[in-house]
Amino acid sequence: MKHGKKSFMIIEAVLGILVILVLGFIIYKQNGHEPETIAVIIPDVDESEWSAFKYGLKMAAREYDADVVIISKDNMETANDEIEIMNQEIAKGADAVIVKPIANQDGQQKLKQLEKSVPVMVVGDTFPEEPSGLHTIEPDHYQMGADLAQKLLENYRGNLIGKKIGIYSQYATSEAVIKRKKGICDTLKGSGAEILWSVSKENDSKEKINLQTQRRVDIVMALDNASFVEAGEAAKDNDLYGAVLYGIGNSTEAVYYLDAGWAQCLVAPDEFDAGYESVAELIKKRRNFFYKMKDRQITYTVLTRENLFSEENQNLLFTISR
């Protein structure tokens, strides 16, 4: 009996030492001086709408002594393409991943599987299922749409009777766009406005959509940067036939169309903060085994020509123009 008890105590002591060694190795690895490598997978990263985001990545990488590798490929069209590239980067030694997902159910499940290998942060859009179980950094999409519609109501003194509205977006299935549209529609209830059409440039029918072929409206509301820039160019060329433009965007082109008078309002999310916080969260997780990553909600600013160059908006404009 004494022999059995002694053996048990020896085994217990050995297991305790092993646990200490494993934890010590993890802490050593995570607190070592070798910079972590974070792979950033964004299909359209060269577009200027990502300038502030990339600047945020750069500043956080400098502060946390990390390496950020940005991967963007034109042929990244499906969730499988995205997952394949992520696996390649992990095989090359990436310690964490930031990804703008091609949002569908299959991609969501595969990202969850991938997160078992390395920490993953989702930016730019979310998945339809809430909660997805993945960590995200994004603005309050519904409230952005609501505030955009509220600015429209303010400019028309709450009376939109007889006004016809067209809603334009890049992707029909984007969860961010769906939430923004709902915010607009809920806010405009009872205003007298009629939403004449709501179309997306890329949709399930593969039909080519453009603004010039839509029925004439008084107001165009663009729900993402690409749509806002396209609508701004159309307004400049008089292809909106007098319709005024309100929208959401975060690029130098979007700011230009507002400043030049081709748009009345631009809601701009703080993408610098999104980039910075993405890196910060992942580094905290890599360097502290017990750290629980958090979802982050970034701020946004309602810009008009009147407040565009105000002192309080200088930092936002600076990061957008980087």
Task: Label each residue range with its predicted role.
Residues 27-53, 70, 134-135, 163-173:
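Short beta-strand segments enriched in small/hydrophobic residues
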Residues 10-25:
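Hydrophobic membrane-insertion alpha-helices, especially the h-region
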Residues 273-322:
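Hinge/cleft segment of the Venus flytrap/periplasmic-binding protein
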Residues 136-162, 250-254, 269-287:
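Hydrophobic alpha-helical segments within soluble ligand-binding/sensing domains
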Residues 69-91, 196-215, 228-229:
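Structural motif
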Residues 106-143, 251-259, 264:
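Flexible loop/hinge segments that line or gate small-molecule binding clefts
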Residues 49-63, 144-151, 175-193, 230, ...:
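Short, solvent-exposed amphipathic alpha-helices that sit
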Residues 98-116, 120, 200-255:
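Hydrophobic alpha-helical
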